[in-house]
Design a protein with these regions (language model features):
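Acidic, low-complexity, intrinsically disordered interaction modules
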Residues: 19-21, 25-121
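Short, extreme N-terminal segment that most often corresponds to the first beta-strand
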Residues: 1-37, 125-128
Length: 128
């Protein structure tokens, strides 16, 4: 499976993901680090996955980074920002920070889903 790391990274970087979003996952595969997710991180991952299911998105592992950002923005609008909040909030620093936070969470979690999908669909190349 280690042989698939570089092609995976290359594909994901080509889709606009940053090395930061991929680094943790790749380092876990190579044994260079282990990831112990906090309760908060697990809850965020569940929220992302639940939202993907709610939107009935089957091809999330093939999304480019721009599409992930749009999805994160929709999520913030649908689930985080209370209805009826005035338009001024949408341009505030607080809102931008909130949106950036959720974009990072979506990027990280979807990179993880993409890695699992990539390795599952390409494992035949190394299982010989």
């Amino acid at each position: 499976m280690i042989a698939l790391i570089d092609p995976f990274k290359e594909e994901m970087l080509g889709r606009g993901f940053s090395a930061h979003h991929l680094g943790v996952h790749v380092n876990m595969l190579t044994g260079e680090m282990s990831l112990i997710k906090s309760d908060e991180a697990r809850n965020h991952a569940k929220e992302v996955r639940d939202y993907i299911k709610e939107r009935e998105i089957d091809d999330i592992a093939t999304y480019d980074h721009e599409s992930v950002m749009e999805l994160a923005s929709d999520f913030v609008g649908d689930h985080i920002v209370p209805e009826g909040v005035d338009e001024e909030y949408g341009n505030s620093d607080e809102y931008v920070d909130l949106l950036d936070w959720w974009c990072e969470i979506f990027s990280y979690n979807i990179a993880e889903l993409a890695m699992c999908h990539y390795f599952e669909t390409h494992k035949h190349l190394v299982d010989r």
